[in-house]
Amino acid sequence: DKAVIIPGDYSKALTSIREKADIFFLDPPYEAGYYENCFKMIKDLSLLAEDGIIIAEHRTNLDMPDKLQGFVKVKERKYGTVVLSIYELGRIDE
């Protein structure tokens, strides 16, 4: 098992990835609204492993949608003013 942290612009970082990942942890600037584009790129580039998850960190004042770019929110955990929304790729019948 290994972890790779890629700081910087998400679009450059995502296009540099050459293998599927089990977990993506998105910690963008909170108010910038990058989530939809990040999810789209991860899906379009087939970067997430079959049973992988995306964890999107955000503030409590942002309601993340239940479905986003083909991914479905399966859990949400609150820690003070921060929320972790956990997504996995939706099934075809959804």
List each model region and its residues.
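Class I S-adenosyl-L-methionine-dependent methyltransferase catalytic core
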Residues: 1-94
